[in-house]
A protein has these predicted regions:
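Extended amphipathic alpha-helical interaction segments
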Residues: 119-209, 213
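A cross-kingdom marker for long, charged
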Residues: 199-261
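Sec-dependent signal peptide recognition
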Residues: 2-10
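Outer-membrane beta-barrel domain signature
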Residues: 113-114, 118-126, 130-133, 137-138, ...
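Second-shell loop/turn segments in exported
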Residues: 29, 33-36, 68-73, 83-86, ...
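Solvent-exposed, acidic/flexible segments
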Residues: 23-24, 33-44, 73-80, 88-95, ...
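Sec/Tat signal peptide C-region and signal peptidase I cleavage site
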Residues: 15-21
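N-terminal Sec/ER secretory leader and immediately downstream segment
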Residues: 21-121
Length: 261
């Protein structure tokens, strides 16, 4: 069980509106221009790499069937549909405004962040970035902009909600005598909150490292618009529902693998 929890924690820490549903074609167009498609296209390899790394750190060999099971769960169409279902709830006006933003140079630059979020890039560049950060700390203005962007995009809350879903899934499959109450789960999430917030801050600084302060102000201004907030809402809700389904199925698959040994 500890191994399963550790694997799932690695997965988590990695990665509302007027209801005139937009079409599948419009959803696909959004996924393409926003960078979300790249993020999900790379997800299978990222999860496989993280499971492999976690096993190596624990000194255990990865069961190939466990890797297959994890990748299968993460890439099931019905699970991805839980994410896109929320994007479909965007009203036409918000959708047009969001697409207009991603058509701008700043929007295109924002979308490219997903291209640099793969494990290989992060492992190679993040340590270098952290060293530079220590040698030349960001200005107070830049740090405040980063914090405001994190707040506007609900990044901290998203991480906490996704972590909570992991603990809920762990709890569901734990022996009856070891199961936690909802309050206990909330306390566990809160105990991880400082670490999560620090990781979100560092990853956001890294993601926007090539953005000027003026560009950060423009990103923040967009995030505060009605349409920007609508985008945040659907992404937040979609990712939480996606992870809720994935975590439950992943635990079941991994437990089935262990029982079959």
């Amino acid at each position: 069980m500890k191994k399963i929890i550790s694997i799932s924690a690695s997965v988590v820490l990695m990665v509302t509106v007027s209801f005139a549903d937009i079409s599948e074609k419009q959803v696909d167009a959004y996924l393409e221009v926003s960078g979300a498609k790249i993020m999900f296209d790379n997800l299978q390899q990222q999860i496989g790499d993280m499971v492999d790394q976690q096993a190596q750190q624990s000194g255990e060999k990865v069961d190939p069937m466990a890797l297959v099971a994890v990748k299968d769960v993460m890439t099931r169409d019905e699970n991805f549909a839980k994410f896109t279902a929320h994007i479909k709830t965007l009203d036409e006006n918000d959708y047009k405004n969001i697409m207009a933003y991603y058509a701008t140079e700043l929007g295109k630059k924002s979308a490219k962040i997903a291209e640099n979020s793969d494990i290989e890039t992060m492992e190679k560049e993040l340590p270098i970035f952290m060293t530079k950060l220590q040698e030349n700390p960001p200005s107070e203005k830049r740090m405040n902009l980063i914090k405001d962007i994190i707040d506007a995009m609900d990044m901290d809350e998203l991480q906490k909600n996704m972590l909570r879903e992991m603990f809920v899934s762990v709890n569901k499959f734990a022996p009856a005598k070891q199961q936690m109450s909802s309050d206990d789960i909330d306390k566990m999430v809160e105990s991880f909150t400082p670490m999560l917030e620090q990781q979100v801050q560092i990853s956001t600084l890294f993601s926007y490292k090539d953005f000027s302060d003026k560009e950060l102000e423009e990103v923040l201004n967009y995030a505060k618009t009605k349409s920007g907030k609508a985008e945040v809402d659907v992404i937040f809700a979609g990712l939480v529902d996606y992870m809720k389904a994935v975590m439950s199925q992943m635990f079941q698959e991994l437990l089935d693998q262990e029982k079959a040994k």
